[in-house]
Design a protein with these regions (language model features):
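Helix-loop boundary and gating motifs at the non-cytosolic
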Residues: 4-7, 15-39
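Intracellular juxtamembrane helix-capping segments at the cytosolic ends
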Residues: 113-127
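A membrane-interface helix-boundary motif in multi-pass transporters
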Residues: 156-174
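Transmembrane alpha-helical segments of major facilitator superfamily
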Residues: 38-47, 139, 143
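Loop-to-transmembrane helix entry/capping segments in MFS-fold secondary transporters
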Residues: 33, 127-139
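Helix-to-loop junctions at the C-terminal end of transmembrane segments
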Residues: 50-62, 158-159
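C-terminal ends and interior cores of transmembrane alpha-helices
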Residues: 73-93
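Structural signature of the two symmetry-related core transmembrane helices
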Residues: 65-80, 171
Length: 177
C-alpha cells in the first residue's frame, strides 16, 4: 500500500531521531545523568506497554482512524512537551515541574511508538496472506531508509531552532504521516 510505504519511511525518520537524540536533547535542557536515564526508560517502557492496548483498539476500529488518532495525539503531546520544557527553568514559583515533562513524554510515547505495528497491520489488511512476509520486509526496508535520515535531519533542525527543535521535528513529522 502506498500509505504503508510513505508512512513507514517517515516513521523510520521519527523513531531513529527519537532514540538517538533524546539523550542529546535532555542534556541540552540541563537534565542530570539520572534524569536522562529516567527519560529514556520512560520512553521505552511506555512505548512497550502501549503496544497491546493500541493494537487491540486497531482490531476493533478502522486502523486508518487509529493511525490518525495516534499521530494527532503524538503531535499534541510533542507540542505540550515543548511548552512545559520552555517553562521548566523559569525562576521560583513560575517554574513548571519536570513531572509534567515526564507525563507528556509518556503520553507522546504511548501514541507514537506503536505506529510501525499499526502501519504494518494496515498494509496487511489490503494484501493476501501469502504476501505478509514480503510486505513486512518491504516496509522494514523503507523504515530503515527513513531511519538513516532521521538523526541527521533532526540534529540540523536542532542546530537551527535550538533544543526544542527536537520536539518540533517530531511534531512536524507526525503531522506528515
Amino acid at each position: 500500500s502506498p500509505f504503508g510505504m510513505v508512512s513507514s519511511f517517515f516513521y523510520g525518520t521519527i523513531q531513529a531521531a527519537l532514540f538517538t537524540l533524546l539523550a542529546v536533547y535532555a542534556t541540552s535542557m540541563n537534565f542530570t545523568i539520572f534524569e536522562i536515564s529516567v527519560v529514556t526508560f520512560l520512553l521505552a517502557i511506555s512505548g512497550a506497554i502501549s503496544q497491546f492496548p493500541v493494537g487491540k483498539i486497531s482490531d476493533i476500529y478502522d486502523r486508518r482512524k487509529v493511525i490518525v488518532f495516534s499521530t494527532f495525539g503524538a503531535s499534541i503531546f510533542a507540542l505540550l512537551t515543548i511548552i512545559v520544557s520552555r517553562q521548566m527553568y523559569l525562576p521560583g514559583d513560575l517554574a513548571t515541574s519536570k513531572t509534567w515533562f515526564y507525563i507528556f513524554l509518556i503520553l507522546f510515547s504511548f501514541c507514537s511508538l506503536p505506529m510501525f505495528s499499526l502501519i504494518l497491520a494496515h498494509t496487511n489488511d489490503y494484501i493476501p496472506k501469502e504476501k505478509f512476509v514480503a510486505a513486512g520486509a518491504g516496509l522494514q526496508f523503507v523504515f530503515g531508509l527513513g531511519a538513516m535520515s532521521g538523526p541527521f535531519l533532526c540534529s540540523v533542525f536542532m542546530d537551527i531552532v535550538g533544543s526544542n527543535g527536537f520536539f518540533i521535528f517530531l511534531f512536524f513529522f507526525h503531522g506528515i504521516i
